[in-house]
Amino acid sequence: MQYEKVKPPENGEKIRYENGKLIVPDNPIIPYFEGDGIGKDVVPAAIRVLDAAADKIGKEVVWFQVYAGEDAYKLYGNYLPDDTLNAIKEFRVALKGPLTTPVGGGYRSLNVTIRQVLDLYANVRPVYYLKGVPSPIKHPEKVNFVIFRENTEDVYAGIEWPRGSEEALKLIRFLKNEFGVTIREDSGIGIKPISEFATKRLVRMAIRYAIENNRKSVTLVHKGNIMKYTEGAFRDWGYEVAKQEFGEYCITEDELWDKYGGKQPEGKIVVKDRIADNMFQQILTRTDEYDVIALPNLNGDYLSDAAAALIGGLGIAPGSNIGDGIGVFEPVHGSAPKYAGQNKVNPTAEILTGALMFEYIGWKDASEMIKKAVEMTISSGIVTYDIHRHMGGTKVGTREFAEAVVENLQSL
């Protein structure tokens, strides 16, 4: 692979993808980019923790810095240069910080572009509670589910045109002339594609995850009562995957009651579905009934951010974007430019995102140690300002919090 302005490390080895599995050396080269705003605070803090955890299990990450966002524009004249995309393609796993996308204009979302170009079709977000973190619900310890959000389609596909544009007016006229559908001419237009292919590969990944991690259920969340041929089709195709490809592992909710009297058989996963708006109150009132959740893109975005509130907010929520043999790991929160460079913000989301990355490459012991060390740090009262304002304790900066996590990690 040729690079224009960056050079891969000479030491370290590539992660390979063979026969549907990652082959991970003890010293993998992993690209990273800090991104915008607070990325320059939280990514170095996370790397400090990740290095300590890797060392603890006798391994080493060889980091390869690449660029996206404002830094990339200054260096390349391009917010998302080919060097960065090529590095992710070549080395297969990357850690990223948040990227800024202006609302209403400028350039299209860099996050969406990365997902589409690399075909990172599943946004995977584990949602679990860390002891000691303030939560708005009475029993946050019941929260433990993983959200699989389809990443490439739906209204986030970026197929849209502004009000009054030639494309929008042409489409409005076409719909009226061909199908008798009337849309006001002063409308912006967006398209909502949901395909059988994209739906099935997402649900397939979610069910495989449930099987491999001994999860009890997979819930298909949709708005199919209104959008029957997009969201409703998502539901139907999801059930098809469960029945046709995982029939020996899966039963439906109806079968659970009709055949088994409501008692879940050992080794079986219950596949069920919920209407999207209902699901928002379900995760509050019936939290522990949900395990793995699969959704289309838009509702997945909404639900995953709402779910983060249950366990303390976006500042501690990790995330990832996964394709076939390729993964980019990013925190859920944004770039928060007003706090950039102040050594103030909470790096927990980025640290736990790194733990999720380690889990993905098979370093599960290191991943668990990181999560335990973060929990120990917060439970001891060492916290950043966002948590301190709710629970008191010792308020520390970004770097100091990371160092406290490292200290606790080394004691394990």
UniProtKB/Swiss-Prot annotation:
PROSITE patterns reported for this sequence: IDH_IMDH (PS00470)
The UniProt note on the cofactor reads as follows: Binds 1 Mg(2+) or Mn(2+) ion per subunit. Mg(2+) can partially replace Mn(2+), resulting in approximately 70% of the maximal activity with Mn(2+) in vitro.
Keywords of the record, alphabetical order, are:
Glyoxylate bypass, Magnesium, Manganese, Metal-binding, NADP, Oxidoreductase, Tricarboxylic acid cycle
- Residues where Mg(2+) binds: 301
InterPro entries (alphabetical) = IsoCit/isopropylmalate_DH_CS, Isocitrate_DH_NADP_dimer_prok, IsoPropMal-DH-like_dom
Instruction: Report whether Oxidoreductase shows up as a keyword of the record.
Output: yes
Cite the position(s) of the site with description Critical for catalysis.
156, 223
Catalyses: D-threo-isocitrate + NADP(+) = 2-oxoglutarate + CO2 + NADPH
Signal peptide extent? none
Could you give a single Gene Ontology term from the biological process aspect? glyoxylate cycle
Q: How does activity depend on temperature?
A: Optimum temperature is 90 degrees Celsius or higher. Thermostable.
Specify which residues bind D-threo-isocitrate according to the UniProt entry for this protein.
109, 111, 115, 125, 149
* Transmembrane stretches, start-end: none
What's one GO MF term for it?
A: NAD binding
Q: Which sites bind NADP(+)? A: 100, 333-339, 346, 385, 389
Query: How does activity shift as pH rises or falls?
Result: Optimum pH is 8.6. Activity is maximal over a broad pH range of 8.0-9.0.
Domains as described in the record: Consists of three domains: a large domain, a small domain and a clasp domain.
The entry's family comment says: Belongs to the isocitrate and isopropylmalate dehydrogenases family.
Matching NCBIfam families: PRK06451.1 (NF005036), PRK07006.1 (NF005425), prok_nadp_idh (TIGR00183)
State the function annotated in the UniProt record.
Answer: Catalyzes the oxidative decarboxylation of isocitrate to 2-oxoglutarate and carbon dioxide with the concomitant reduction of NADP(+). NAD(+) can replace NADP(+) with low efficiency.
Q: How does it assemble?
A: Homodimer.
Q: What is this protein called?
A: Isocitrate dehydrogenase [NADP]
**Organism the protein comes from:** Archaeoglobus fulgidus (strain ATCC 49558 / DSM 4304 / JCM 9628 / NBRC 100126 / VC-16)
